[in-house]
């Protein structure tokens, strides 16, 4: 069965004049090369071409050694970890004549209680064998082709959905039937005395899709294949799989199929993605389904609150997604996100995802692990490597029984291999970071500082030319500045603090803000400059436009605002005093840009940005942020900058005042509510400012996937 690769264009990055800040990590910022050479997890090859022995479905002695493996999927149920892959047999027979390749869903069953050394020892035993799940040989002229096993669990049951096609030899010519969906449900049972681990007893293969349903007939859908990766078990017990469907016009759509009765009946979603959007990945977040798809020249994110009856394109919501570049660059060389799961760790609901990036100067594709609570994200580090320059790096994540596993397809000298890793040290780091997030939220809440939408804080932590984020995620770089309590003093004409928030840095993708944010800082101007001097500047850019907003101060003791896009700058003035403490803030709400001094608006401007595109670059800079020839270039003066707070939403004046005043809250009684370490409190409403954003609003970094086009030319 022929397969063609779907490649979407990578986003062309706007080049800016500044160096980027260090990546979101607690340790010192490192180069891309050093990041790649960092610790590697425990790893063991599960599926190896021509080595792994697989038993046929139903048992028997017809053992086979398969030729390649792809599309990993990983689940845990009833004390058994089940690792799945798409296995392929050779396309040549014993006479070296070409035949139609066949494939199947294959699986390892592993005891979830095993220590890593035990697991490796058991799998290495000659008696240890993997299993086939779906496909079978029916005579010499008929083979089942199984594609993209996709799995999820409920209680002790494992649900596996895959695409399937039947190939037949008619007069010496191979032909295919249409791609159909197959579902099989397995019950996990405990091992017998003669077995190394528990196993899964699979039921009969089903066809879950009613092809006479309105959703199929109205769209004239003719072929279906599962997405691969993981399905979702919703909080209400609904089982959901993502899939792709092709219509009579050869257009491909992404959609879902779901069951509300434990798999007895299945329904296809009424709504679909845009045409030619493939490789859906889904997860549940705060009661909604998120679906991320690869389209022709961009990534799209959809949100549904009604099981796919309607899908709303969420522009700028899942901010890790690459969007239309207009560059024509191959996605093979771009960053993208692959595996995605939702888990509860340290009492906090988070998403874990893997992101691929290219190592500088090498044909290697490190796989990075991230954790996000949709408010902030932490870069854990590289967890895998693929030495094939243009190969798809597929992966699956599983968090279960207090352990984190990665199932990864990689290319080695033995071919396409599926490896299992236990991310023990990575999980410890994630737990430590999430604990820090909770502690910081509680601390700032105790000072009446709002934590809803709080992304990062720069205060007293610093070192090696960096101003470190209290939440360990978003460090700033410092040049020619002196450390003071809770911040830095800028003492030279070229002194600056640069905080790169949305950027590509060290082959990693950092996206923290959409078209809504507030940055708040405390400043003291020690002496009067000889000319107009830049204090705080924000540079914003997407693929089609860029914009600068900022605040400067003059020799005649006036504040001046700067709002510059395609129009001429506009300014408004207000006096300032030397050695006096001020709270300064920049705010973006949609296209409305604002500057505040001590909670009072100093001026507003229209940000000439494209709403349909996310902000690919957001840079904040204190001090020497502009070219020296600029009329607002920094003069030699001393400015102290302390306690910088960054929010992914607008703040109102009451909240800004709370940040400045920091009034301790009396200890709460037993009835107080701090959930998951995150403050749940009413945010005062000010007209024109959406200040009642819930915790976790502003969905954050998720996914970019390589598109593997699985629909054959039938």
Swiss-Prot record:
The lineage of its organism: Eukaryota, Discoba, Euglenozoa, Kinetoplastea, Metakinetoplastina. Residues 1-24 form the signal peptide. Pfam families: BNR_3 (PF13859), Tr-sialidase_C (PF11052), TS_C (PF22925). This is 85 kDa surface antigen. Keywords: Cell membrane, Glycoprotein, GPI-anchor, Lipoprotein, Membrane, Repeat, Signal. Residues 692-714 form a propeptide. A lipid is attached at residue 691 (GPI-anchor amidated alanine). Implicated in attachment and penetration of host cells, possibly via a neuraminidase activity. The gene is GP85. The keyword Transcription regulation does not apply. BNR repeats lie at residues 258-268, 302-313.
């Amino acid at each position: 069965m022929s397969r063609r690769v779907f490649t979407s264009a990578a986003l062309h990055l706007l080049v800016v004049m500044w160096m980027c800040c260090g990546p979101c990590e607690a340790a010192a910022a490192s180069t891309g090369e050093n990041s790649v050479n960092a610790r590697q997890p425990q790893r063991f090859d599960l599926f190896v071409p021509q080595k792994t022995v697989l038993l046929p479905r139903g048992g028997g002695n017809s053992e086979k050694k398969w030729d390649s493996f792809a599309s990993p999927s990983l689940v845990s149920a009833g004390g058994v970890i089940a690792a799945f892959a798409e296995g392929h047999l050779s396309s040549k027979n014993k006479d070296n004549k070409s035949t139609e390749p066949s494939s199947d869903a294959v699986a390892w069953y592993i005891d979830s209680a095993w220590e890593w050394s035990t697991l490796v020892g058991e799998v290495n035993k000659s008696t240890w064998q993997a299993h086939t799940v779906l496909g079978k040989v029916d005579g010499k002229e008929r083979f089942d082709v199984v594609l993209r096993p996709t799995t999820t669990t409920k209680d002790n049951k494992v649900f596996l959905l895959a695409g399937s096609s039947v190939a037949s030899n008619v007069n010496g010519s191979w032909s295919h039937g249409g791609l159909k969906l197959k579902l099989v449900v397995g019950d996990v049972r405990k091992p017998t005395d003669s077995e190394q681990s528990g196993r899964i007893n699979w039921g009969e293969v089903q066809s879950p899709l009613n092809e006479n349903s309105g959703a199929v007939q109205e769209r004239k859908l003719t072929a279906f294949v599962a997405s691969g990766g993981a399905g979702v078990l919703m909080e209400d017990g609904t089982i959901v799989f993502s899939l792709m469907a092709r219509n009579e016009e050869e257009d491909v759509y992404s959609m879902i199929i779901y069951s509300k009765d434990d798999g007895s009946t299945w329904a296809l979603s009424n709504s679909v993605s845009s045409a030619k959007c493939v490789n859906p990945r889904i997860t549940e977040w705060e009661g909604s389904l998120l679906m991320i798809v690869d389209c022709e020249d961009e990534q799209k994110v959809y949100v549904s609150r009604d099981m796919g009856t309607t899908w709303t394109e969420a522009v700028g919501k899942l901010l890790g997604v690459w969007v239309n570049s207009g560059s024509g660059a191959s996605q093979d060389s771009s960053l993208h996100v692959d595996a995605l799961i939702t888990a509860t760790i340290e009492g906090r609901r988070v998403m874990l995802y893997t992101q691929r990036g290219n190592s500088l100067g090498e044909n290697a594709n490190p796989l990075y692990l991230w954790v996000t609570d949709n408010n902030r994200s932490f870069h854990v580090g590289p967890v895998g490597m693929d030495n094939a320059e243009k190969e798809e790096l597929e992966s699956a994540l599983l968090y279960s029984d207090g352990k984190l596993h990665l199932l990864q397809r990689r290319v080695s000298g033995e071919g396409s291999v599926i490896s299992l890793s236990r991310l023990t040290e990575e999980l410890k780091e994630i737990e430590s970071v999430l604990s820090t997030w909770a502690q910081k939220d509680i601390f700032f809440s105790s000072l009446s500082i709002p934590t809803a939408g709080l992304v990062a804080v720069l205060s007293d932590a610093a070192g090696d030319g960096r101003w470190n984020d209290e939440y360990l995620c978003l460090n700033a770089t410092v040049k020619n500045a002196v450390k003071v309590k809770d911040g830095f003093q800028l003492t030279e004409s070229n002194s600056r603090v640069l905080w790169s928030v949305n950027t590509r840095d060290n082959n990693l993708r950092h996206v923290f803000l959409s078209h809504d944010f507030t940055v708040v800082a405390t400043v003291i101007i020690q002496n009067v400059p000889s000319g107009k001097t830049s204090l705080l500047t924000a540079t914003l850019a997407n693929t089609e436009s860029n914009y600068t907003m900022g605040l400067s101060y003059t020799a005649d003791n006036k504040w001046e605002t700067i709002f510059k896009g395609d129009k001429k700058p506009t300014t408004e003035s207000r006096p300032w005093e030397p050695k006096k403490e001020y709270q300064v803030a920049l705010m973006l709400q949609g296209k409305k840009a604002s500057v505040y001094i001590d909670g009072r608006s100093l001026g507003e401007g229209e940000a000439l940005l494209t709403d349909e595109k996310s902000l690919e670059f957001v840079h904040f800079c204190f001090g020497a942020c502009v070219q020296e020839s600029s009329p607002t270039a920094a003069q030699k003066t001393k400015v102290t900058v302390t306690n910088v707070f960054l929010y992914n939403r607008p703040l109102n004046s009451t909240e800004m005042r709370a940040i400045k005043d920091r009034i301790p809250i009396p200890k709460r009684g037993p009835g107080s509510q701090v959930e998951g370490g995150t403050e749940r409190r009413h945010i005062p409403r000010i007209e024109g400012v959406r200040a009642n954003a819930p915790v976790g609003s502003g969905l954050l970094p998720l996914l970019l996937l390589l598109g593997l086009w699985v629909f054959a030319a039938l």
